[in-house]
Structures are given as C-alpha cells and as structure tokens.
C-alpha cells in the first residue's frame, strides 16, 4: 500500500540537482515531503537520529554515487549496518550520472538497493517508481 504522504530523501552534493529533482517530484502531485541531504554522512545522521528527534522516516531515498567525503558506496556500507527497524520500509534508488553497466551491476549487488536510474529524475520516472514500489 502506498503511504498517504511520501517522505523522499535526496542524497546528492549538488544543490542544483537536489532543487531540480525536488521540483520534478512536486510535479507528480503526490503528497510528498522532500528532505535534501548533501552527503552520505548527513543522510546517515538523519536516519540514526529519527527515533530520538522524531524526524520523519523516508519511504524513498534517491542516492547519488559520486560525492566528496562519504560517497554513495560509503553510505550503502554504513546503511547496511543500521538497525533493521530503521531500514524497514525504505526503498533505496541509485540516482547518478553514471550509465556504466559495471557501476549498475555493483549498485544492484547491494540488497538494500531496489533500483538504479540515471539523472535527471523526471516526473515520469518518479511516477513509474511509485507505481513499481508503492501500491495504492
């Protein structure tokens, strides 16, 4: 069942990409709450503090691969160590400029990764992902 309000986390060091992708998400007219994070470390900090802080749990995480500091691979490594209750119900989608087949295979080898798409995220791609992973 699709959640009434989708909480979507955008993990990308590029503020312009986050702005553009948030705008495309809003075009779907879904009830969404978007949380932009500029690094894997920021995203993990948010996820780790959800219980104490009352932060909204994301239902969908769009994760870039190439970021300074903790990149997407580092995020996935640390994410896999999180409590299963935190991971439960979260769909992780790699959102990257890389169309390298080897990169896609590597990403999809992570059990926590549900999908892999190349930038840019569009309204149509977002709607397809919602139809694929969240049923009304």
Where on the chain are the PLM-derived regions?
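His-Asp phosphorelay/catalytic-motif detector in bacterial-type signaling
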Residues: 4-5, 30-31, 56-60, 85-91
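Alpha4 helix (beta4-alpha4-beta5 surface) of REC/receiver domains from two-component response regulators
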Residues: 74, 89-90, 98-115, 128
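Active-site residues of response regulator receiver
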Residues: 63-64
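Conserved active-site segment of CheY-like receiver
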Residues: 13, 93-99, 120
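Helix N-cap/capping motif at the beta->alpha junctions
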Residues: 36-49, 72
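Receiver (REC) domain active-site loop signature in two-component systems and cognate sites
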Residues: 67
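Non-catalytic signal-transmission and effector/linker regions of two-component phosphorelay proteins
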Residues: 1-9, 16-22, 27-30, 121-136
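Short amphipathic alpha-helix used as the core "switch/output" element in two-component signaling
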Residues: 73-86
